Every structure is written in structure tokens, then in C-alpha cells.
Amino acid sequence: HPFKNHPFKVLDDEKMQDLVESVKINGVLTPVLLRMDENEEYEMVSGHRRMHAAQLAGLTTIPAIVRELSDDDAIVAMVDANIQREELLPSEKAFAYKMKLAAMKRQAGRPKSNSGQNDQNLIGTVSRDVLAEQVGESSKQIQRYIRLTELIPELLDLVDNKKLQFTVAVDISYIDKEVQEWI
């Protein structure tokens, strides 16, 4: 089954058709990444598009790697495997960055009970800087993308479809969601 809260869209577009044709000719060349979930079922961490293409191509089996991964390790692996894809939608980057940043903060450890708020902010800032370096974006741009997750779905779709400018959308994200409904 698919990874919970998977932020990347599997679209039946021209690129998918190209992938299906490639799979028909060559098979699936790169294994998908799976893990066992709490119900002892296989959960797809990475490879949702390859799996979909294989199904459309009529394949019944594909190569897979099964790893023992915590939730945070699975999130990091899923985002890392997908974030380098060309033409990611702003919404995909937004939720992927948000998920990975949260996982990185948890992996960095929670502050001790006697530490101040500044320590927690430092963990967040350092994690955002590390993420920015990993994906080739500025720390500020990571922050802007994550703000998009505060938009109502209708406005986020407008950003994805290039009908709402990115910077305007970031500004709108600070407005209460009930007010966003009126926009």
C-alpha cells in the first residue's frame, strides 16, 4: 500500500505514458523501496510512479528492496528519492519539505526539559539550513514552500496550475483559512 501522507502525485500524464512504454520494453530497472508497517504489510516508501507504470504495463511483479525503517527514516528516504525529480509541483515540494524538516527535527532529538525555547529554534534553523543545502534551495525558499501548506486546497491547486503567483500565495498563507475561502 502507498506511504501514508505521500506528498507526490502519481499522474496519468504523458510522462507516465513514456514510463509505461519504457517499462514494457525494459522492465522496472530501479527497485522500489518497501518497509513493513505496524500491521506486517508492505508499505511503499519510494517508487509509486514505477509501481503504477508497471501495473499499467501489465507486470505482476517488480524488483523491490525491503528495509527496516522508522517513520522518520522512511520520510527522509521518500523525500530524498523524489525531490530531485524535474518539474515537481509547488505543492509536492511544500509538503515534502515540511515532512522531511519535521523528521529531521525529530531525529536531531527533542530539547532537554531544562533547555530554553532558543535551543528548539536553533534545531529548527539548523535543520532547515541542512535541508536547503541538500535540495539546492535557500533556507528562506524552504520556509516559503512550507508556508504553502497553510493554503486551502483550492488556492494550492491554483499555485500548481500557475494561476496564482508563488510569492502572492506565500503572502496569502498567513491569512486565516476561513478568510482564504473568500479569495
Model-assigned labels for residue ranges:
Residues 174-183:
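A short, Lys/Arg-enriched interface patch at domain edges and termini
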Residues 11-14, 18, 48-49, 70, ...:
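Charged, alpha-helix-enriched surfaces in structured cytosolic catalytic cores
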Residues 1-67, 73-87:
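Short, charged/polar connector segments at secondary-structure boundaries
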Residues 85-175:
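Alpha-helical interaction elements
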Residues 17-20, 98, 181:
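Amphipathic, non-transmembrane alpha-helical secondary structure
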